[in-house]
Every structure is written in C-alpha cells, then in structure tokens.
Amino acid sequence: MKFILLFLILTLLSFSCRENKTVNQDRMIDLDDSSKKETIKAENNTHLQNYIKYLATLKETDITSIPKAINYFDSGFDNIDNRIFDKLFAEFNNFYEKVMNYQKNQFSEFEYNEQLKIYEAMFDITSQTEDWIAPNDNQKNYAVFLKENGLNLCNIEGNIYVCADYVYSFEKLKDKISLPIEQYLIQLQSESEELYTSDAGIIVPLETIANRIVFWENFIKDNKDFIYINEASKLFTEYKKAFFYGMENTPVFDIETKTLNQEFKDGYNFII
C-alpha cells in the first residue's frame, strides 16, 4: 500500500507541475530557431561549466553538500531550456551518488541494532512487544539528518542501507527538468520501494516485472536521445532476463514435472 500511495503522489506531483513547464517548453522551441540557437547554446554551455566548477568546491564526504549542490538552481534558471537543464541534472546526480555512496559506507559500519533503530526513527515504526526499545534522540537526529539532506534508508529482507531519495530531487527540480527525467525519477522511486530480487531469487509477482518491462520498453522507444538511455536500457534488459529466464532460486521450469512453474505461467498469461 505504501508503494502504491507513493507512486500516486509522485504522479500527481508530476501532473501539477506541467503548467509550470510552459516557459521551458517554449525555450525548447527557441533552440530550433537558427537565429537564436547559437546564443542559447553558448548561454547554456556557460551554465554547465559554471556548475561543474561549483561542484568541484563541494566535499563528497560531506552530506550537506547535497542541498548545496541542488540549491544552486534556486535562481537564474527559470528560462533555461530543459534539455540543457537535464545535463545539469546529470552533473548533480553524479555528484549526489558519490556523496550517497560515502554515507552508505559510513552507515554500514554501524551495528545492526543501531541501523535498525535509525530506520525505525525515519519511518516512525513502533512495536508492541515488551522488549522493544524506542529509538533514542541520537538515532532520531541521525534519521532526520539523512532525510533533510536528501538521502533515504532502504530495508530489503533485513538488510538496511542508505539509498537515494528520488522524491527529494524531484520536488526540488520538478519545474526545471524535462518530462522524460520526471518519468524516469518517478519510476526509479517506485522500483526502489519494491526491489524485485534478493538471494538469487525473484521476490515480487511476475506481473510486477511484466509491467516494468512494458514501461521501460515504451520509455526507451519514446526517448531515444534520453540522457540516461543506457541506464534505462540496462533495467529493461535485466527485467526481461528475469522474466523469461528466471533466476537460480526462482526457476522457470519445474525439473521434476518438466513443466512451467505456476508463477511463470501466470506471468506469461498476464503479459499476453
């Protein structure tokens, strides 16, 4: 239910900001006007180079570098062509992942119970068991610290780790990024909330994987020049392999009966 609600919220947010994209869409039309093309191209290149220089002044080991990197776009970017802004987003995202990976490594050094309490604090999880202990102030503050600086915690079958908060980026930049980037972020957030594999096995219904295959197939077809087309293609390929070939602990065929396992039979019927 949490996954469904989050997806709906993100989708509504996406629709709500379409009207605000009018300026950017007009700016895209300007790029096709030869009399303005070179001027706009030079202007946008300056934006990109200035941002790259700015990122070089920020520390990848400092989590507060994330809001600094994204708040750079608070002013002076209202009329920039959103295809060019997507390149700026790519620079931000690359930097974001470096900071996230550092924080992930730091978090992995905590004892498991410490990780669990921080996770419980972030998502306000409680328990009625007698021996349950509520997160302390330090754990609560750490959870807030991560969230306020654009990072999230994921818990996959008890494995807790620092992960991306795509809602953070989307909310901050929704009026500037292109529609494909919007769709890309929404889909990544949805999939990060429900990972499809663990321990060499498929842990979601085959229908879920089928829907992702359809989404990425259409997305790639409609956005051939997308800045993250390679990443989108990789996801598309991964889901197809899982769907049609299964995984070590989720085989397509039952060796003993020499027939399709029921979950794959249902999945194939669904996609047909």
Model-derived regions: residue spans:
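Short coil/linker segments at helix-helix boundaries
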Residues: N113, K117-I125, W132-P135, N141-Y142, ...
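Bacterial signal peptide processing site
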Residues: R18-N20
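N-terminal Sec/ER secretory leader and immediately downstream segment
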Residues: D30-L153
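Sec-dependent signal peptide recognition
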Residues: M1-L8
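Short solvent-exposed coil/turn linkers within tandem alpha-helical repeat scaffolds
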Residues: N82-R83, E171-L179, F219-N230, I271-I272
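Structural signature of alpha-solenoid helical repeat junctions
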Residues: T208-N211, I227-E231
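C-terminal motif of bacterial Sec signal peptides marking the signal peptidase cleavage site
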Residues: L13-S16
